Every structure is written in C-alpha cells, then in structure tokens.
Swiss-Prot record:
Name used for this protein in its record: UDP-N-acetylmuramate--L-alanine ligase
An example molecular function term from Gene Ontology annotations: UDP-N-acetylmuramate-L-alanine ligase activity
Organism of provenance: Saccharopolyspora erythraea (strain ATCC 11635 / DSM 40517 / JCM 4748 / NBRC 13426 / NCIMB 8594 / NRRL 2338)
A Pfam family reported for this protein in Swiss-Prot or TrEMBL: Mur_ligase
One GO CC term on file: cytoplasm
Length: 490
C-alpha cells in the first residue's frame, strides 16, 4: 500500500489483493475512453459497477444497458450506489484531486486505484500484449485485436477507441490473451508487464506532465524494462526514438524484432513497397525470407506500418499467418481514425483524432489519394494549451499540406488558458495564401464557415482530440441547407 500527496490509498497492482478489490467498483468519469473499457470488462466478468460522468453519452447509455449504475454529475453520494461502500474507486488522470467522489473515498478509507492499475489487475492470468508509442497506439492495438479475432483466439482487449466492427473499446474474451493500448501520457503504463510489447514511435509529447523531452523518452525506456523475462519488443526501426529503444533493449538482453524499410536481421519485417488503393493499401513485406503482400483496409503508409507491427505481434502470440493476413485485410477501422461521416452535395466529410504535428502530417498525406480531383479542406482544433505553445510552428507546417485550412480555438481539456496561446498562433504561420487559411474562434460559427468554402468534389477532414468531432454532422447539414440537395451516405 502507499499514500499519495492527496491522502489517497493506492495499492501495488501486482499484489494479489488488488484483483480481490475489483468486486464492487465505482469509476469516476466512467464515460471516458479508458474508464468505459474497464467498466465493460468488469461487467462481463460479473462484477458490480457504478460510476459517474459529467454528461450523458452514447457510452454511458450502453454501460447502463449492461447493468452499470451511473450518476450524472460529480457528488460525494455517488459512491453510495451499492449496499455498503465500494471495494475500490477507480480514477483517471483527468479527475482533479478535489473531485467530491475522490475526496469521499479517501475520507472513508476506500482504496483508490488509478485507471492503469485497475487495468493491470484485470490482466492477471493472461498473456499480455501492450502497444505503446506517441502515435498509432489505438490503430495498431485495434488491428492486432481484430486480426486475433479472425484467428478465433477471442482475446480480451482494452483500446482507446471504438472498433467499427463491434462499436466497443473493450471485451472480456476466453482466449487467455489480453491486448491493451498502453498510454504513456502520465507514465501509468509502467504498471503493465507485457510479454509482447510494441513501440510504434517515440517523439516528445505530453510535456505538461513529463516536463522535458528527455524525461518523456526515459519513461519509454522504463516501460521496455517491464517486459517479462523471455518476452519480446517489437519496434519501428524507421523512427529514431523507437530504434534507439530497440538498440538499448537488445544490449540489455531483451529479444527484439524490428519493422521498417531498412531492417536486415532474420525475424525482422522489411517493408519493401507500398501501393495505395482507393481507401486502402497494400504493403509488401519480407519476413524471414518470405515475401508477403499485406492488405491494409485503411489508407496511408503510417497505417501500413501499424499493420506490420500488428502482424509481428500476432505471430509472437501464436496466431497463424493466414488468419492474421485475413484479419488485417478485413479491419474496419476505429472510430475517429479517418472515419467517414457522410456526404452532401458531392462533399465528403471525414473525422480524425490526430492532435500532434506528426499525426496531422501523416493523416493529410494519407488523405490526399482519397481526395481525387477535389480539394482537401481541413478543420483543425488544437488540443491543450501546452501542446499548442510547444508545437505551433510544426502544426502550421503540417497543415500546409491541405488546400484550405480552418483553425479553431484551443480545446483546453484539463488545462487552464495560457495568455497569447490560441488557434491563431497556428493559423498565422500556415504556409498557404492568406485567403486559404481561416481562424475561427467561435465553435458555433465553424460549420457555416466551412459550408461556405466547400464545393462538390471536396473532402473535409475535421481533426483534433477535442469536441471537433461534433462538427462533421453540422457541416453536412449546413452544406445540404445551402445546396438544397441531400445524398445518401456512401
């Protein structure tokens, strides 16, 4: 047991009593991507689950239908939804220390678990595969999960996005394998002990928590040290940060498999070609002397690299090659990862979660072949004041790959505003003619603005980790209103 500065009781997730605590569980912020996944698995395992969230949502309604007792708003009495106190309260890093439910749990001596600690306890008695990296975690974890499902291995999984196939971000399976997205943002992935660890890339981010790029890199080094004896690190050799990790791990005696364009060792996956197809692609890979064509059902070379990582991880988990290839070809994508939202008057609208300059760059390059003869119109909402201040120039450069850019104001999430840090900081540096770059501080004015800019054949891409995802349907409605035409989704 340990106590933090706020007086909360925390437990070592490797201890046997942590799993025993997950009987009557209250989750603060249960509607979030990570917390809802834990709730789904607990419910599937027959545990009692209560929770709270700031607002109603599709996720909250789905969890209620599964049997969770959920209150809207945060109040101390919300933890009293069981007969007696909960056996544990689970919180995410988004929950402030003065949250009344967290305070009530601390005052009553109810054990408090961080989200990752609860997830680690759910992994007990499973062979664990964790996917980490600055970018590509959700897509790679999802590809691996779907590929294993096609091999009929029925993995348990917890992902930071909803699979389009099932609409779920988590599942309790009977296959003895647990696949999880490992979030480095607060360092909490250090509680996991995977036998298969994937690192897609390492590039400075979340400096609001880690402080420096060096500290951010160090937390990945510590994650690799958590790999179980006899386990394997799968790392992207094309990324400098991941390649350095791989070299360090190998020197420490960890078995390493690399993927990328220049790898040469037996067991590595060398990507020797990529052919884009409409809305998808094919990557040619050489592995242990075999040459494979891997069909990837989502566009972009970055997605092809993610698929190769998933392929190697699946092989390490004992899945058959043919089944993995079939699963990757059938992969239906993840919600908010270049997700098609609809079409109106010849204008297609997609939505994507990209919120780091490298992600924005990769997704715009992937979208370009899909655009065709029209224009690529991007609506970008910066996420976090700290990230906007640190990377405004890089964001501007990446957005210059579009034909028309609308930059919204910053979605602050957990952060307070910073003087002088707005979306305009990015917009004023986008390397496009001024008439093709628009800063719109009013969220409600964004959809009418975009509808007035687009023409038939254009592709609109809303982009960011905040509530910009809500704009897609509004843009479609505005386009229909202006044109007087309605088209069926395609």
């Amino acid at each position: 047991m340990r106590t933090d500065a706020a007086g909360g009781t925390y437990l070592d997730p490797s201890a046997a009593d942590v799993t025993a605590l997950l009987e009557r569980v209250h989750l603060v912020g249960i509607g979030g991507a990570g917390m809802s996944g834990i709730a789904r698995i607990l419910l599937a395992r027959g545990r009692q689950v209560s929770g709270s969230d700031a607002r109603d949502s599709r996720t909250v309604l789905a969890l209620k239908a599964q049997g969770a007792h959920i209150a809207l708003g945060h109040r101390a009495e919300n933890i009293e939804q069981f007969d007696g106190d909960p056996t544990a309260v689970v919180v995410s890093t988004a929950i402030r220390r003065d949250n009344p439910e967290l305070v009530a749990a601390q005052e009553r001596g109810v054990p408090v678990l961080r989200r990752a600690e609860a997830l680690a306890a759910l992994m007990a008695d499973h062979r664990v595969a964790c996917v980490a990296g600055t970018h590509g975690k959700t897509s790679t974890t999802s590809m691996l999960t779907v590929a294993l499902q096609h091999c009929r291995l029925d993995p348990s999984f917890a992902i930071g996005g909803d699979l389009n196939e099932s609409g779920a971000n988590a599942h309790h399976g009977d296959g003895g394998v647990f696949v999880a997205e490992a979030d480095e943002s607060d360092g909490s992935f250090l509680v996991f002990a995977p036998s298969v660890a994937v690192v897609t890339n390492v590039e400075p981010d979340h400096l609001d928590h880690h402080g420096t790029a060096e500290a951010y890199t160090e937390v990945f080094q510590r994650f690799v040290e958590r790999i179980e004896p006899g386990g394997v690190l799968i790392a992207c050799a094309d990324d400098a940060g991941a390649a350095l990790l791989a070299d360090q791990a190998e020197a420490a005696g960890v078995r390493v498999r690399r993927y990328g364009h220049e790898v040469t060792a037996d067991g590595d996956a060398r990507m020797v070609g990529y052919r884009p197809e409409h809305g998808s692609g094919v990557v040619t890979v050489e592995v242990s002397g075999d040459r494979l064509d891997v069909q990837v059902a989502v566009p972009g070379e970055h997605m092809a690299a993610n698929a190769v990582a998933a392929l190697l991880a699946g092989l390490e988990l004992g899945a058959p090659l043919e089944g993995l290839l079939e699963g990757l070809a059938a992969f239906g994508g993840v919600r908010r990862r270049f997700e098609f939202k609809g079409r109106a008057d010849g204008v297609r609208v997609y939505d994507d979660y990209a919120h780091h300059p490298t992600e924005v760059d990769a997704q715009l390059r992937a979208a370009r072949p899909v655009v065709g003869d029209g224009r690529l119109v991007v609506v970008f909402q910066p996420h976090l004041y700290s990230r906007t201040a640190a990377f405004s120039g890089e964001f501007a450069t990446a957005l210059g790959l579009a034909d028309e850019v609308v930059v919204l104001d910053v979605y602050g999430a957990r952060e307070d505003p910073q003087p002088g840090v707005t979306g305009e900081l990015i917009a004023e540096s986008v390397p496009l003619p001024a008439e093709r770059v628009h800063y719109e501080a009013s969220f409600t004015a964004a959809a009418p603005l975009v509808a007035g800019l687009v023409q038939p054949g254009d592709l609109v891409l809303t982009m960011g980790a905040g509530d910009v995802t809500m704009l897609g349907p509004e843009i479609l409605a505005e386009v229909e209103r202006e044109s007087g035409a309605t088209e069926e989704d395609a």
